[in-house]
Amino acid sequence: MAETLFWTPLLVVLLAGLGDTEAQQTTLHPLVGRVFVHTLDHETFLSLPEHVAVPPAVHITYHAHLQGHPDLPRWLRYTQRSPHHPGFLYGSATPEDRGLQVIEVTAYNRDSFDTTRQRLVLEIGDPEGPLLPYQAEFLVRSHDAEEVLPSTPASRFLSALGGLWEPGELQLLNVTSALDRGGRVPLPIEGRKEGVYIKVGSASPFSTCLKMVASPDSHARCAQGQPPLLSCYDTLAPHFRVDWCNVTLVDKSVPEPADEVPTPGDGILEHDPFFCPPTEAPDRDFLVDALVTLLVPLLVALLLTLLLAYVMCCRREGRLKRDLATSDIQMVHHCTIHGNTEELRQMAASREVPRPLSTLPMFNVHTGERLPPRVDSAQVPLILDQH
């Protein structure tokens, strides 16, 4: 009964939590080739009443992924500076991404452990208006990616860039963190930023100032450590510190020539003095070659084996034949040597020679006295009288 009373409130709390995590749905309309920015605000996920501000100490983190996949699509990125700051989903869709995509976002409250889900329905379509064939990319070293994503800094950058470009409408095409391009993480010093690449497009041609900055002469000066060729006033300073040595201009007004599609031929090469086709070789039977390769070494080995056996077994003289061929004087001399050797060995084994006195036990080298082996050694003085 006690266990039932314990589990009932717990199940009620879990069911209430599941009810809180019911996914909200929002429909967005990204455009192909244009930057898309969606802010993940704490107010949206906390579901606070109206006119109630978000507590400054709240900690919320987000996890976003494509529905049915563990990660985001390749054109979409996510960033959040800290749990106190909002998160951002940003990127630029490509023509291959055109269509419908569903992004699932889960918010985690690190203080109360509440979980809230949101479903973003992205209907990716083509942009309206004129094409933007003139595109320029700038490296801004004074900002991080999440500092440029809000609409206010982005509009300020486009307005400042208008002083360097021909009159015309400028549109933001893409924003990429410098860390995603191989940049280094800055030191934790005040004023150091990661850097961000900002890509801008326009229907108006590039100005002379921008063409001079992106010219080969300007890049050569940058490679030598000199300032680039900037003939106009830098209207982006001091709010945006642009690295003018990393400016890229892309002109898509001139269509690129289409790749030639190779046409299949008849398979017959034209006359070429450097190409000598191989002649047709008739069919050959390699059975004879294989037999010769295998049998000839075997026959040679067999003949050598028979010859060696004949020499070792049939050509031996034998002891009797060898003794008959040896003279009697030589045989007597040989037997005498063996007999004398045996006699010397017997004499050496039977001789009795007294052992040297120095090797006998209890022998005094000074007096020459020798004690019997059974004398009590405890009664013998350590130092004998020397006469």
Curated annotation (Swiss-Prot):
Membrane topology according to the record: Single-pass type I membrane protein
Tissue: Most strongly expressed in skeletal muscle. Also expressed in cardiac muscle and, at much lower levels, in lung. In the fetus, most abundant in cardiac muscle and, at lower levels, in lung. Also detected in liver and kidney. Not expressed in brain.
Residue numbers bearing the Phosphoserine modification: 377
GO CC terms, sorted: cell-cell junction; cytoskeleton; dystrophin-associated glycoprotein complex; endoplasmic reticulum membrane; Golgi membrane; membrane raft; plasma membrane; sarcoglycan complex
InterPro entries assigned: Cadg, Cadherin-like_sf, Sarcoglycan_alpha/epsilon, Sarcoglycan_C, Sarcoglycan_N
Function: Component of the sarcoglycan complex, a subcomplex of the dystrophin-glycoprotein complex which forms a link between the F-actin cytoskeleton and the extracellular matrix.
UniProt record similarity statement: Belongs to the sarcoglycan alpha/epsilon family.
PANTHER family on file: ALPHA-/EPSILON-SARCOGLYCAN FAMILY MEMBER, ALPHA-SARCOGLYCAN
Descriptive protein name: Alpha-sarcoglycan
Species: Homo sapiens
